[in-house]
Amino acid sequence: MNNTEFYDRLGVSKDASQDEIKKAYRRMSKKYHPDINKEAGAEEKYKEVQEAYETLSDTQKRAAYDQYGAAGANGGFGGFDGGGFGGFEDIFSSFFGGGGMRNPNAPRQGDDLQYRVNLSFEEAIFGAEKEVSYNRESSCHTCSGSGAKPGTSPVTCQKCHGSGVINVDTQTPLGTMRRQVTCDVCQGSGQEIKEKCPTCHGTGHEKKTHKVSVKIPAGVETGQQIRLTGQGEAGFNGGPYGDLFVIINVLPSQQFERNGSTIYYTLNISFVQAALGDTIDIPTVHGAVEMSIPAGTQTGKTFRLRGKGAPKLRGGGQGDQHVTVNIVTPTKLNDAQKEALHAFAEASGDKMVHPKKKGFFDKVKDALDVD
């Protein structure tokens, strides 16, 4: 057996996270569960999935498996180097009972879920309330999560006698060692369901569409998360639901940009407004604000509108809006505008690379030699 077969059984990569391994296990175990899949070979596949998950869900066993393969995960090495004592630690731990084993019958919280919600630029600044709808594993409505057919109850597992674990003998360099593994009949619950629920087929869960209202505070930004306790997937053995993490994605604005509580706006003005000054209505998310542009304003000059930015999530208060001036140079001029600009250049003493063309009256004066 190569060192990737267990990963292949679950359909995950070798660098998969524990969360990815857990989700893959749940998906594959449902796919091949003998009570659901009646095809030939499904039961064998189911056992292979159980074996793979038993190893990969345990960090120490997984490390030994990655290094030595199945023999390493089970404590039976063919050899080791100076850094390969992790497997022997597992052996002694199993033999002497060190480290203990998590109670498989204990209630376990359900998996967490993520949901991405899009907000407009303004919604992120002022806050909003959104109703989100998503599919999740919920407690079965027929059996209330017990997995048993209504009117019946689970019985003590005959293989593990309710402990949820069984003893397995393993051949190691030190001889035969006995270790405890999760019971493959009850999957660690300690109970066996003789008559399974017709809705959930004994899992105790069913996929349902769930809706929840999310209050989004003012001032949120892209990437921030809101945690909703108990809105994730159903737990196990009577454990609580997991949590829902709502991930914020703020859509861009056509007018503004934002960094934290500061909003940025680019104001395009003419060179006449820049030279002579003007009073202009500036758009903000809070409404238009009148702002004075002083005479002689240069392009790139930034003005601050205090309190016209986004709320500060921490510390309270309101950010500012920065208004940066951009002087727009006209690309098309009529004759009157050109004459006026040439006159301005002459009055300013500017030397033109291309002097202005003579007008009709100038040409007449030249022809008559009149000053």
UniProtKB/Swiss-Prot annotation:
CXXCXGXG motif repeats lie at residues 140-147, 157-164, 183-190, 197-204. Binds 2 Zn(2+) ions per monomer. One of its GO terms (biological process) is chaperone cofactor-dependent protein refolding. The keyword Cell membrane does not apply. GO terms for cellular component: cytoplasm. PANTHER family: CHAPERONE PROTEIN DNAJ, DNAJ HOMOLOG 1, MITOCHONDRIAL-RELATED. Belongs to the DnaJ family. Homodimer. This is Chaperone protein DnaJ. The gene is dnaJ.
